[in-house]
Amino acid sequence: MTLHAYLGRAGTGKSTKMLTEIKQKMKADPLGDPIILIAPTQSTFQLEQAFVNDPELNGSLRTEVLHFERLSHRIFQEVGSYSEQKLSKAATEMMIYNIVQEQQKYLKLYQSQAKYYGFSEKLTEQIQDFKKYAVTPEHLEHFIADKNMQTRTKNKLEDIALIYREFEQRIQNEFITGEDSLQYFIDCMPKSEWLKRADIYIDGFHNFSTIEYLIIKGLIKYAKSVTIILTTDGNHDQFSLFRKPSEVLRHIEEIANELNISIERQYFNQLYRFNNQDLKHLEQEFDALQINRVACQGHINILESATMREEINEIARRIIVDIRDKQLRYQDIAILYRDESYAYLFDSILPLYNIPYNIDTKRSMTHHPVMEMIRSLIEVIQSNWQVNPMLRLLKTDVLTASYLKSAYLVDLLENFVLERGIYGKRWLDDELFNVEHFSKMGRKGHKLTEDERNTFEQVVKLKKDVIDKILHFEKQMSQAETVKDFATAFYESMEYFELPNQLMTERDELDLNGNHEKAEEIDQIWNGLIQILDDLVLVFGDEPMSMERFLEVFDIGLEQLEFVMIPQTLDQVSIGTMDLAKVDNKQHVYLVGMNDGTMPQPVTASSLITDEEKKYFEQQANVELSPTSDILQMDEAFVCYVAMTRAKGDVTFSYSLMGSSGDDKEISPFLNQIQSLFNQLEITNIPQYHEVNPLSLMQHAKQTKITLFEALRAWLYDEIVADSWLDAYQVIRDSDHLNQGLDYLMSALTFDNETVKLGETLSKDLYGKEINASVSRFEGYQQCPFKHYASHGLKLNERTKYELQNFDLGDIFHSVLKYISERINGDFKQLDLKKIRQLTNEALEEILPKVQFNLLNSSAYYRYLSRRIGAIVETTLSALKYQGTYSKFMPKHFETSFRRKPRTNDELIAQTLTTTQGIPINIRGQIDRIDTYTKNDTSFVNIIDYKSSEGSATLDLTKVYYGMQMQMMTYMDIVLQNKQRLGLTDIVKPGGLLYFHVHEPRIKFKSWSDIDEDKLEQDLIKKFKLSGLVNADQTVIDALDIRLEPKFTSDIVPVGLNKDGSLSKRGSQVADEATIYKFIQHNKENFIETASNIMDGHTEVAPLKYKQKLPCAFCSYQSVCHVDGMIDSKRYRTVDETINPIEAIQNININDEFGGEQ
């Protein structure tokens, strides 16, 4: 047995010497003694290619490239393997999770964490870590006996030891872990004749675990020769750049001493890898104590980008330059990263530049539709059919793939489910899921067309098919008793779903279409699923288990599944992490994300055992564990060194100033260190570089057109743009090869969000030959014509959800107050506290079950909200009693509807208006409350409108003047037109147009001592003071509040008197009768003007800006109109807000509808 060590810094030819040596042996004797090259898993393919691609090698059976586990299998083939079944990673984790659940009550520190999935994963990692470093449960138990140990540490180790011991007992004589198989491999080494004849080479490692050192020791002892290659200068200083590989060398020296053999060291000092002085100097001086600055020759670049996306776009452009101008191949280029956020950017950006690439990382299968379907199916059963997992299950399209437009059908089903609050076993209620119920979805009174009916029938059928499958699955699983039964039931359910046939069909189609990677994913998904089921049967077999526990354990197994994708082509860019990727001798290496916090990366302890506990363990038990955080932090410079020395020709470092979440980022201190090694190595700011060199952006045809669009848009906004972009536009426009899609991009340049004015015929088709509308519809048009067009022309509806909306709350208050008002005939004065509570309870019991399919009884939160609503109603009734006590006006009519043709005698007649086109305008609506007061054969009427929102409980006469607030004037006009139907006298005059704010009042106090309990209720009631406009007629003023006298301001209506008895300007909101009539008549003209504009086909995106606010803030149609402040601000409509509306209305002549003058 001989031991060789090839030692040297990066690029000094160590691996080349090894490969040359192996190849010479292969050429000299192709059938000679075995040669084994041991390398990390990530390097084996690359090293195999080095032999396969050598034209001088005509094939050989001598050499094998293996990692430690594959080497153990090779020995087992010769001497015989272990009799136990080997546990996969998933099987190990499932077993440990089940043990944790069984032993939970015995845990001391981790009892509360045991129920979480992540805990068993951490515990599995810790046990595997112990096994790698040859720590047994006995080691832990011996260590726990230390009386000086902290209680928390003692409890922690006792918990881990308990699970570890139980795990070892479960697998004893029946199963074996990957770590244990390596120990068995060590035991088998003396029996292997093949190993005794072998020359062993170990390359690509920078550190080893205890079990791996034991393997190396066995190889040295039993193999013919062992050669280990290490990237180190041999310096054992713990603060040296090469601390980590030097630590390996120290361990190898200890092994050699134990075996009483010497190490034949060969030092490599001459640099061979690097093609230029820049990279040689970078490698030699990176760890130098005294800096020797030299001129940079341009083979090292540092790029600064504003964002990570801009950074990767620039890398993609530079790769294209490498291929086109430097004649590199994609396989000559590598990208190394550390921040996981970059992986998504590679997938989203590199395909845009048609750059082939392979990311050397394993991807979890959990997000694949098939896996999402299975996990959602499990959650449906676990959660008793809750809506979220059900919808996730449906949206995977795995169980609904046989339906045409299945995604659209599922969307409709989702709308219905969210509107009706379907959950639990309500999914099984066929009465809920019928076509008639679907017809009412979001559109009251709508009659289904034949096509709509057929679509909804398909939705119902799809839902029934999926439910039948879930019920079959649930039934099969509920009949199982053992794990084997459950696994069998699960597999049979998948066959019942026809999942195997469906997946194989999809795989074949993908293969035929050349999408081999996606096809491979499907194969791995199915094989992985079967493997988990096999593991469950292997580990648990006929062990009894509850369905709930089985589904938990099964889900744990699914979490472990990962895609292992083989590169689809040899000529592609290699992408990997700086820590794990094995890329050597690339012509150009890009190191992206070189930011502080990423390189170096703060290393924090993520295992259950803390750094302090590791150190204590090593000191007391003399057992080495995995490196602590401070040791790993010292090795960050080595990680950077290894990454940047992978290139032969060029190295490009890049970083961004903003992270993926918008946070500020700083440059890596390593880049500052690198920059200090060279003169004239400047950081290239990418935006500034492109501004000076616009041609550098023109590397890829499609992406150039997108950048061209941005440049031309800037040019149109009078920004300075390089002439190169105008020249580029002409070249692209005149080229048949390049101009595809250019017209579409150019049309976006002149896009100004202009809508099309509807023609007369189309307007009538959309809106009808007469307009039947509520007041709010006209107010909506005044807010924005497009809003009206979207809601009443296109009839777009928001998805209705099973939750209480603001308008639902308003409807509840209206209905409750109507119910109570009718019960007491509007005589609020008669109410006492007992009566208020009785009537409130009656009203709520009658009305709340009708709200949103009994929504307010669906959960504890909504039942609490119901009580809050009751409290608000009780306070409101107290306020109404207070107001009624001091007013001569009596509430007479409640929730009074009006329309052109009344349906009952209680409804009022609304006079028809006519647009300028001759289209009838029929206004309909409902007046909350009409109060009347009669004196001297003259009836005065108050319009009372209940509002649950404070913002809408104010009458703004400027808005009234401009037609933005039309409700109150319309209601008063309707009442004045219907004196006979309302039972009023021949002479009827307006009293007040008033808003009543239904709310829960709040009063602020500076301290508890300021609260006067006797006055508190009175103060709360005064918060309900009516707001609006009152007729200045003295009869009306006196009747509104009988307490009015000089120097008194009413707390129930907006009226106050001065010392001389005149109306106070500050405390009164009044207008004379003639002015109110003018407002009413002007309001009619606003109706006519608005309706005429509607029928003229106006659909402009033109919101009306009032008091610096836009209606867009609360508009549901922004995603449709795409309103943009930069593009559409010129279309914002405004009004003169400085006018005095009363003076303005008095100064204009208003014609009544018969052409006379009022």
From Swiss-Prot:
Family annotation (Pfam families): ADDB_N, PDDEXK_1
Binding residues for ATP: G8, R9, A10, G11, T12, G13, K14, S15
Assigned EC number: 3.1.-.-
Residues annotated as domain UvrD-like helicase C-terminal: 269-583
Enzyme type, top EC level: hydrolase
MF-aspect GO terms: 4 iron, 4 sulfur cluster binding; 5'-3' exonuclease activity; ATP binding; double-stranded DNA binding; helicase activity; metal ion binding
Cofactor(s) required for function per UniProt: Mg(2+); [4Fe-4S] cluster
Positions with a binding annotation for [4Fe-4S] cluster: C784, C1112, C1115, C1121
Any GO BP: double-strand break repair via homologous recombination
Residue ranges of domain UvrD-like helicase ATP-binding in the record: 1-275
Keyword Cytoplasm: no
Keyword terms: 4Fe-4S, ATP-binding, DNA damage, DNA repair, DNA-binding, Exonuclease, Helicase, Hydrolase, Iron, Iron-sulfur, Metal-binding, Nuclease, Nucleotide-binding
Entry note: cofactor: Binds 1 [4Fe-4S] cluster.
Transferase keyword on record: no
Family stated for the protein in its record: Belongs to the helicase family. AddB/RexB type 1 subfamily.
Additional record remark: Despite having conserved helicase domains, this subunit does not have helicase activity.
Subunit structure as annotated in this protein's UniProt entry: Heterodimer of AddA and AddB.
Function of the protein: The heterodimer acts as both an ATP-dependent DNA helicase and an ATP-dependent, dual-direction single-stranded exonuclease. Recognizes the chi site generating a DNA molecule suitable for the initiation of homologous recombination. The AddB subunit has 5' -> 3' nuclease activity but not helicase activity.
NCBIfam families xref list: addB_Gpos (TIGR02773)
Record-given protein name: ATP-dependent helicase/deoxyribonuclease subunit B
Origin species: Staphylococcus aureus (strain Newman)
Gene of this entry: addB
